[in-house]
Amino acid sequence: MMTNNDKMLAQFGADWVKVRDYIKSLNMFYISYTPTFMVRIEKETGVPANTVKSILDYGLQIGLYGKTSDRDYITLSPVK
């Protein structure tokens, strides 16, 4: 049975996979949460920056990413 999280990530389809893999390839714990970084991901993956923001926002909402004290950065959350 698909959970709501699975359904939402499925909505992003291949875009989610491209963004996830690109972020993984950076080997960074802190991920920049700025328009500049979202445009950088767009240039590297071809996924529109607005979609990148939606993916990161949803990742924050479901706990894939965590907030930091600096609003310009998010972190990878530990896998539960």
Give each language-model segment a name.
Residues 71-78:
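Minor-groove-contacting beta-hairpin "wing" of winged helix-turn-helix DNA-binding domains
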